[in-house]
């Protein structure tokens, strides 16, 4: 029997929350109030994120909060309060943290509110919003804390996911983003086909020739592999596919609709590849600039660009970020589990 759409979102949220909670409780040296509050906040942020993939929820949010600017800022104010409260819980509240959190949440919302009158294409306002969401985390401009504090995930990643989905779906009303989380047959089909093509013809040949991948000798227990895949899907695949396929590729394709779709796919894949320029996986080529030496992970950039091409194909074929996010999790999971000694 097919799971009803809303039931799927509830079951998925609850399942992620239970799994994440059990893992953290089993690994904790002691169960503190801070840990329990952190887990509750994690569950809340996962639930709101997953709920916004339900078209009925999106429609209700648009009717409730999408009619005037003050109403539109109410959910973001909720995220801001959660952020401040969590920083207080960790004794990590600073004036700069408050200011950067405020700017991170409200500037994209204001820009996208005034961008609603324009066509759903790449404009300077939504480009600025995308860069703020991306670079504030990439450059550690927002507080670098985890949830839970010990052994958790980046707190602002969950804040970013909620805010970017809310800003573009509810405020900007970008209905072409393709934010859907319930998989169908096409999602699995394209994910598996492109996974096989990428690994067989690109990842393994290029990876071994360049020394980027090595057969691991320290195997993790097999039961951990599905958990690794789920973690990568939620905290790497989903955010990166939202950003690079659902927003950057999508808006560029709309902006340059008279340009070959393959060129847009190529261009967005190159952007995706160079977004990994700060990764620390050898081999490197060293660039000397302003008296400093910068290691450039050239093999990583090449393979990421090629992978980005296949992620983009999955996005184009399905019209959803889900297929590329699944494919992304499969690719990274394959690398992490089987070929990454680190």
Q: Residues of each region from the PLM?
A:
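Membrane-interface helix-boundary motifs at transmembrane edges
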Residues: 55-69, 112-124, 147, 178-186, ...
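Canonical alpha-helical transmembrane segments
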Residues: 44-66, 84-85, 107-115, 241
